[in-house]
Structure formats: C-alpha cells, structure tokens
Amino acid sequence: MILDATPIITSLLDTDAYKLHMQQAVYHHYSDIPVVAEFRCRSDERLGEYATTLRHQVDMMADLSLTNEEFGYLQSLPFFKNDYLQWFKHFRFKPEQVHIATTADNQLTIKITGPWREVILWEVPLLALVSEIVHRARSPQITADDAVIQLRKLIDIFYRDAAEQQIDLADFKLMDFGTRRRFSYDVQRAIVDELKNHFPYLIGTSNYHFAERMQLAPVGTQAHEWFQAHQQISPELANSQRAALQSWLDEYPDQLGIALTDCITMDAFLRDFDMPFASRYQGLRHDSGDPIEWGEKAIAHYEKLGIDPMSKVLVFSDSLDFQKALVLYKHFHKRIRLIFGIGTRLTCNIPNITPLNIVIKLVECNGKPVAKLSDSPGKTICEDDEFVDKLRKAFDVPLVRQAC
C-alpha cells in the first residue's frame, strides 16, 4: 500500500477554539491528571480499512509545532496567559498516545491515553482526519466548488423563507462549527471564505487556524469533557457539575462564559445553575434534546432568578442547518439573544455525500469511569453501567435508554 506523504493536518491551530481554552484551564488546574478517550461511530459504518492511512497521518502530526506567526496571534488574544503560551510553544503531539486498531468485523477503534493536558488536543484533528480520509477514498471527484455551490443554494432558500415569513434577520448570528466532521480541509476553507465574503451574519469560526487566516473571531468555550472529567476530580460526585462551573470561572472570570448544559441533562444542570452562576455566565449552549423545550426552560430559569433573558445568550449547536436555525430564530427572537453554530451541515453538505456520524469522547479520568447523560438518549456515552447508575442517582436523573 502506497501512503500519501502529504499531511492533512498542517497546523496546531487547525482545531476547535474550545480545545485551547480548555487546555489552558487544564494546564493551570489539572496538569497531571490522566485520561482516556475513545472513538465512536454512531452509525453502522465499517471504517477499519482506513486504519493504516490514519496511522500514517497521525504519525506525521508529531512534526507539528506552533509557528512564530501563530504564537504572536495567540498572544494578541485576551484569553491566554503567558505561562500557558510559553508551554504551548513547545507542545508536540505524541503519536504513541493514539492506539488505532481494527476489529474482526472491520470496525475502526481509536483509544487515546495520556495526561489530560495533551490528550485534549487529539479529538478534533483525529475526527477531521477520519472524515477526510474516508471521503477522499469514497468520493475523489468532489471538489470544494461542489460544496460552495450547495451552500449558495441553501443560503438562497434561507433568505427566501425568511422573506416569506417576514422574519427580520437583523439579529441573526452564525458561527462555523464545522471542523471535526468536515468533508475536507479545502472544503471548510472554501465554505468559511464564502460565508465571510457573502453572508453578513457570520460572526466567527470555532477553528483557530481559519480565524487567524481570515481575520475572523474565534469562538468556543468548553465541551462535555470539562464536565465529565470533574466527575472524577470533584471529591463529591453530586457536586461535580458545580465544581466544573466554578473552576471555569476561576480560569475565565469575565470571558468565554457560555456554559454547556447537557452533560447530565438540562434539568440537572439548571438545579446547579443558581443565581451566582447564572449571573456570571453570559449564556448557555444547547447540544442535545428538543431545542425549543430547552430554550423555554432556559428563559424560564432566568426569569425565575429575576435575570432579564435579553441580557443573556443561547447558543444552539445540535445538528443545526439553516432551516432549523431559522425556525429557532423565529421562535426566540427578541426574547433572548441568539447565536447559531452550524457544523457538519456547513462543511459536509454536498449532494449525494453522507457525513460520518463520529465522535471521540472521554471515558476515563484518574483511572475511573466518566459518563455523559445526554438530553438525547442516542448521544449518551457510557462505559460502566454501575457508574452511570451512580451518576444518575447523584443528580436525580430518571432512567433512560442508554446508548453504549
């Protein structure tokens, strides 16, 4: 087998912004904590045949390092402290942390082990690699132009629907969340460039590389792993979500204040999200469950606490496309501020192409299991039934069908 000597990932910054934001917090607070993360394919795909190509690409990532220009760019941002940046300047990927194998039925398995401060950066480029390797092999005829043509059609429909429903788009805000399951690097670059130049409602991208290259705002706060890890960091399981929320404020007291709500369901989150947290965090992010029901709960919670919802923001990011975003915008507009993060349906929305439904999630921290009890049962991650039961009881979460 002849392997392509050209690396797909060519920049440390070709990742989601929240990975660097979380990495800095981990570096400062939990530097030596060991974790394990694992790959999941949520569909019936047989991806084992791509293991050798993936291994080759992962090995080439050992050569990546921050350029002087990238270092200067990160220094110019208000989020990062100098001690972290000096450490990150010398950061190198360690391919030996990534264990890639194939099962008897041709499933791809990926397991990442090591210190959290290092493992944290593997998820996004690994998923982008799997996606691009598979799509290159299956659909070599597809170009970035195909994706841009489709995007223009979707935007035309978006404008037409908004006009027909007399929706004022003045407050519509879009963010690109498309790195991890993009068709390819070239497609994401073309899509973000098209949006920047022709869609006035784009406010930023979650990808630091494209943010730097295209002078866009980098966007992102924290992911499920932040809350999951605290399940085995916090001395008391029932207090772990509050510990995660507080630790984030300790690192970022007055910025990056969007909290993710569905690591242990929205209802359990809101029980912990009391006045001190609700007043300090700028808003909430939706990533599973019914988005309208979720948004109504968020607004009601703010109102119950005496907080004006229009002083807060809801970020919707669960399987969004332009049509879903417009429905949500119409429903919540002028009741609370809104931002829409669209990912796969921006960067892998091409006729006759099926995006991969793949994730990499934390499964262990400090040698013990962690779990995610999503608002969508199919997105629940569990490795240990006994721990899931403990977590459910600690947070008073009803038993739901698990997807392990």
UniProtKB/Swiss-Prot annotation:
Against CDD domains, the record matches this protein to:
PncB_like
> Organism's domain of life?
Bacteria
Q: Which residues carry this modification: Phosphohistidine?
A: H224
Hey, which family's this protein in? Belongs to the NAPRTase family.
Q: Which PANTHER family match?
A: NICOTINATE PHOSPHORIBOSYLTRANSFERASE
Which GO molecular function annotation, any one, does this entry have? Answer: nicotinate phosphoribosyltransferase activity
Among the GO biological process terms of this entry, one is:
NAD biosynthetic process via the salvage pathway
Q: Record's HAMAP family?
A: NAPRTase
Keywords tagged on the record: Ligase, Phosphoprotein, Pyridine nucleotide biosynthesis
- Quote the NCBIfam families the UniProt record gives: NAPRTase, PRK05321.1
Q: Which Gene3D superfamilies match?
A: nicotinate phosphoribosyltransferase
EC numbers listed for it are 6.3.4.21
Hey, which pathway is this one from? Cofactor biosynthesis; NAD(+) biosynthesis; nicotinate D-ribonucleotide from nicotinate: step 1/1
From which organism does this entry originate?
Answer: Proteus mirabilis (strain HI4320)
What is an example of a Pfam family matching this protein?
NAPRTase
For this protein, the record's InterPro entries field holds:
N/Namide_PRibTrfase (IPR041525), NAPRTase_N (IPR040727), Nic_PRibTrfase (IPR006406), Nic_PRibTrfase-Fam (IPR007229), Nicotinate_pribotase-like_C (IPR036068)
Q: Which reaction does it catalyse?
A: nicotinate + 5-phospho-alpha-D-ribose 1-diphosphate + ATP + H2O = nicotinate beta-D-ribonucleotide + ADP + phosphate + diphosphate
Do the record's keywords include rRNA-binding? no
Q: What is this protein called?
A: Nicotinate phosphoribosyltransferase
Gene Ontology terms: cellular component: cytosol
Function field: Catalyzes the synthesis of beta-nicotinate D-ribonucleotide from nicotinate and 5-phospho-D-ribose 1-phosphate at the expense of ATP.
Gene name of this polypeptide: pncB
PTM: Transiently phosphorylated on a His residue during the reaction cycle. Phosphorylation strongly increases the affinity for substrates and increases the rate of nicotinate D-ribonucleotide production. Dephosphorylation regenerates the low-affinity form of the enzyme, leading to product release.
